[in-house]
Swiss-Prot record:
InterPro entries hit by this protein: Ribosomal_bL32, Ribosomal_bL32_plant/cyanobact, Ribosomal_zn-bd
Name by which UniProt lists this protein: Large ribosomal subunit protein bL32c
Species this chain originates from: Pyropia yezoensis
Major subcellular site: plastid
GO cellular component entries: chloroplast; large ribosomal subunit
Region (Disordered): 1-26
Keywords in alphabetical order: Chloroplast, Plastid, Ribonucleoprotein, Ribosomal protein
Entry's Gene Ontology molecular function annotations: structural constituent of ribosome
Highest taxon in the source lineage: Eukaryota
Length: 59
């Protein structure tokens, strides 16, 4: 017969939730930073075709 496990304490639940939220915050900051660097063309991780890119941004 299946027996329910012991309940997780509030402290453990809150610690896991805080860890999860902190990881999400870090990823959001990285994504925003990457987006800003791409928009200002200061990123080194991407190769731009400057002839096509200048046409799209000149509008």
């Amino acid at each position: 017969m299946a027996v329910p496990k012991k309940r997780t304490s509030k402290a453990k639940k809150n610690a896991r939730k805080a860890n999860w939220k902190n990881q999400a915050k870090t990823e959001a900051q990285r994504a925003l930073s990457l987006a800003k660097s791409v928009l200002t063309r200061k990123s080194n991780g991407f190769i731009y075709n400057l002839t096509e890119a200048s046409d799209t941004f000149s509008d």
